[in-house]
Amino acid sequence: MDKIGKDRNDKYDNGEEMQMKITAGLGSIDEYERFVHAGADEFFCGYVPNEWTKKYGTVMPLNRREVLSYNVQIGSLGELEILAAMVKEYGKPVHLTFNALYYIPEQYPEIAEMIKKCMRIGFDSYIIADPALILYLRKQHIDCEIHLSGETAEVNTGMVDIFQQMKLKRVIFHRKNTIEDMKSVITHVQRQNVGDTEGKRDVRPLQSRLEFEAFALNELCQFTGAFCNSLHCDEMGYLCRVPYLLTCIKNGQQRNDYITCGKTTSDRDDIPGQETPSIEIPAEDDTGYLPGVSGCGLCALYRLKEAGITHLKLVGRGNYTDFMEKDIRNLRRALDILKASKTEKDYINSMKKILFPYGCSGNCYYRQHYYRSKK
């Protein structure tokens, strides 16, 4: 790690070691207190007023989580007021999400008014995916804190330069960014702030520095969010949940050589010339819980910290509350192990021994890093 990164990301201004913070998904206000006690540093949650749902339905989503049948988001200003009181009591901030990739023209003033109401009761930070909405808010002189959503797709140095003109507080890297990509962007931003001479220290207060967030646990998706056109609602299954088999297609191979929806691996015909892989299923606990079963980046925490990541996203709005609480506790435990480890190898060995004694899911967020570390 270069000197700029070390000075900028590993130490607070008082010399104390800087730790990556846990940003956890919140499905309802009932979860807030439990998740605070579990170890979350901050939260993100959706807010879709009932008035919006009645007017636009599910086909024009506000945050791409238009689900009503279980707890995924908050649906009234009254609930937000209760949550605001809890935030004031515990001091753990909540960021509201507006993750739709675009809106129609008439919706921008409506969203701006919605954000003003939320700001009046104490919510100052917003996760936004639509660049036009960010620009609109700034042109309306709405001075809220903006986090660039992980649904915004490609993140590179040129993109960050443009968005910094709109006074971003945080960049959330999307699921397909490699650790090398993240480090390149972060180093670029740091050198802009302190100059090209290594060893200089960023003397700005922490509150004014650009933060960087990466996915750490749950909901690894095969698609890139910015190019996903699936509706996430009660009326139909998510496109990313449709079963499929990823395999090589060979010239002349017949249609019936492929797996069909509904078949299991055990009853399909083997693909000619290939052996059916055997999959070892790791042991879950007695409640059916396994950390990171839908996506895990715990092995990469050492590299993420080296790259300059300041916050770790723990996805899980709508998950079982008990499982989310365990996820937060396990991510906190992994960070404690990281703090006590001198090398990456020490960290991974200790973390796997404690959190995955019977094996992990193998569903890696940062697979390139994982395979490189295994060589």
Language-model region placement:
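Short, Lys/Arg-enriched N-terminal segments with co-localized hydrophobic residues
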Residues: 6-18
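Active-site pocket-lining/capping segments in soluble small-molecule metabolic enzymes
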Residues: 15-154, 180-313, 317-375
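A polyampholytic, Gly/Pro-enriched intrinsically disordered region
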Residues: 167-174, 235-240
